[in-house]
């Protein structure tokens, strides 16, 4: 009986200290963060879509998704990045 009580206590302690993934305020935010920008200009013909990184990220960025499904981080303050966004919005 003592063995099963000890096992129950261990399981209870483990369940208490282990938080479910949905308890995190960031669990539903699945957008990636960027830590560096592309140094050059990405060819527009390679770009399929874009999205902005979360405001929770330390570095604001636009993520361009290429036709090969690669994600490329770009500086949202660059003129070419804003032009690409405008072109994608118009199409």
Curated annotation (Swiss-Prot):
It comes from the Eukaryota. GO terms for molecular function: CCR chemokine receptor binding; chemokine activity. Pfam families: IL8. InterPro entries: Chemokine_b/g/d, Chemokine_CC_CS, Chemokine_IL8-like_dom, Interleukin_8-like_sf. Residues 1-23 form the signal peptide. Keywords: Chemotaxis, Cytokine, Disulfide bond, Inflammatory response, Secreted, Signal. The keyword Secreted applies. Its main location: secreted. GO terms for cellular component: extracellular space. It is found in: Secreted. Disulfide bonds join 33-57, 34-73. GO terms for biological process: antimicrobial humoral immune response mediated by antimicrobial peptide; chemokine-mediated signaling pathway; eosinophil chemotaxis; G protein-coupled receptor signaling pathway; inflammatory response; positive regulation of cell migration; regulation of insulin secretion. Chemoattractant for blood monocytes, memory T-helper cells and eosinophils. Causes the release of histamine from basophils and activates eosinophils. May activate several chemokine receptors including CCR1, CCR3, CCR4 and CCR5. May also be an agonist of the G protein-coupled receptor GPR75. Together with GPR75, may play a role in neuron survival through activation of a downstream signaling pathway involving the PI3, Akt and MAP kinases. By activating GPR75 may also play a role in insulin secretion by islet cells. Belongs to the intercrine beta (chemokine CC) family. This is C-C motif chemokine 5. It comes from Canis lupus familiaris (Dog).
